């Protein structure tokens, strides 16, 4: 490689051949590899030898440009200062402008690379930049463009070092803003926009910010002054500049005639470009844009329209220059929109009014309506500028831009101009029916020479840019604001775009104007896609038509049109037939729900539905932490507020009801409403309560969780008395969540309406009977009824009966626990009427009455068993209990509607909380019964503290459990008239269905003892 490089450099190559050789060396990276110091040294020696000779200086500069770009860092640092001096000598010499231009080109690359090296940049900024700027300012007029390029490079790479020459540089640049050479004017404007960043910015660039704000105010003031001189006497608006800026020191305009008007027009255009660059260029410090002053200037310029000027005298020249002035002011508006963005929304009404005002003012000029097809429309460049700014405004502010949404007049004008610019021209044939009598018949060759020409001169590129700009602006408006645009606008656009695209695909012989260009056809396809994606809510989207048209567009001869049609077709197809579920953010996994029999009717409240319930999306994203169905925190008293809604999936908190026996048996049943299966009957395994006692969960020190010992001490007492009632009932609760626990999955039975919203837990003890083997059956005899709730039960009877059908297989097993003697007693005693039977079918599991409803309780009858029958209407009355019902069935629980309230609790009752349930372990609440007619609503946080007031205990509480159960039917039995035959059948049916409600499939851990 070294030999090849040396051979190429030693040859005498022409400028073109040397350029090709340098391009090849750079492509191969010949000087970037390691171990090539000889090649780099050969390049540097060849470069220095050619720079010393004036005849080969161009070749030397070309090799120097290659060395600056390809040299490693150490070589660059070593030779950078010497290269800079060589370039400065070439700039100060009287070399041709071409050599000076090439030297400035190498200088720009050298300054850009050296500014990134701290040590080198410090030396150059201190010792070389001021002299370099002085040399550039002294170049002759033929080298103004290279000089300005070099000055701009110094401003960008070493702005701090250029601050000492700010005044001289400002005067030099202002003198060039009126230059007739457009290239000089553009570079001078670029340099002028960088003046505020020169010098030291002090703390946090405060000096830079002040310089920028002062300079932009000076530019605005100068624009007002120049416009006043240019169109004095033609303005109808009396607005003037009231800012803090001072006019720039331009040289005065000597000629008041045509030359003066042209000079003022060039100055106005240059100042507008300076303002645009001030707003668009990156600045090292935050600045404040004077939006009000800028918009006032824009409105003042736009208000001067062609109707204010005439085509005679000096005003004709001003009228010719007015489109250029308007285009310049539109560039300022576009730069302001880009710089400020949505902060301009308070001025949206003013900005939206500018577009139709400009389009309408230039469309009303005389003589522009008779332009034949195939010719460029007048003021097309100005209209393109309007559509470009419109697209920028809508893209920046979106649907808040207000385009085509404001006053009907302005929206209609804008839409009409857009449609006229995207509609292809048509040839109009004028037919005349007037025939002069006695006139000579014309020859065919003489007909239509002026009115009908099938072949005329046309420009195939005419109005292509205008049509493309209008389509882009319209696509942007429809895409961002299509859903709020009027229905009529959508209909008109559909009626225009769809037939036109079909004509284009069919290859119509008619000339279609700008749609010969592939850019216009592509934008027309894009308009149809935007109409499909953002339709009006009251108008159907052209989805199916779009699919057909896009399918035809895939065969377009233009590659960009076919590529876009393929993309649009894929979008439309996926709208109609999604292939797979879309990727979603990680969702919490719900706790597993127990299996429910398919034929069981449910009244379960709506749960959180997934986007694809049938087939969950197989996301590869990691799932979020699961939201527990039940709180895993230690149990808290009922007075503490309920868990937040997100822990119960947005539902209301549940109220748990537990049924504990004085003598825990392996077959005991614990029923909890803290389950998302609405009703869960869980068979508690043997030893579960013992485990929970050994591992009590923490609770607040003020309230001690009930223990089994307390229950055993209170167990000898009789059935709870009526003096004990539940606290004031809160609102009804919703359906329970999943009950997580160590035991097997609960077997769901009949669905229940949502329980009260916030209620305290209720623990009810039911004493066992004489025969322990029939312990489940004798507790069922008196758990259900209350005459005050029968109205609601009538409404819920049908739903509960449907829920009971799923447990038909339990009825046969439950019949085994009913003896013949019990059946005879049931036929003899008919104290339960039809309404009481309905009540038995609808009771909630947390409200347990003993026996059926009794109309009257004789004096002297023990009412201690009313503890478990307290409802929100007041203390219930005991119903007569037959002797045979004591051994009827096992534990029987029915689910009431959501209006039912919890029953009372006996003092000291309850067992320590097991892992199966998460109800707060609190002592039973003993409060007086609530009034029977006005149940006060009560939130969970308002529940009074747990107390055990001194209440009278019936004497029967001192008797043993067996004796209490034996005497119980005699004490509460009240003679009643025999029921009718229909009532007997209803009682039998109700007993059968109530029996189905109790027995459940055995637990996975341990089978319960069979009922006898």
Curated annotation (Swiss-Prot):
Pfam family of the protein (one): RIX1
Main location per the UniProt record: nucleus
Biased composition (Basic and acidic residues): 965-979
Chain location of the short sequence motif LXXLL motif 9 per the record: 524-528
Motif window: LXXLL motif 2: 63-67
Motif (LXXLL motif 1): 21-25
Residue ranges with Acidic residues bias: 769-844, 936-951
Motif (LXXLL motif 8): 415-419
Keywords, ordered alphabetically: Activator, Cytoplasm, Nucleus, Repeat, Repressor, Transcription
Keyword ATP-binding: no
Residue positions of motif LXXLL motif 6: 223-227
Localization per Swiss-Prot or TrEMBL: Nucleus; Cytoplasm
Biased amino acid composition, Low complexity: 714-725, 740-750
Similarity comment: family membership: Belongs to the RIX1/PELP1 family.
UniProt note: domains: The Glu-rich region mediates histones interaction.
Task of the protein: Coactivator of estrogen receptor-mediated transcription and a corepressor of other nuclear hormone receptors and sequence-specific transcription factors. Regulates oocyte maturation. Enhances androgen receptor (AR)-mediated transcription in a SRC-dependent manner.
Name recorded for this polypeptide: Proline-, glutamic acid- and leucine-rich protein 1
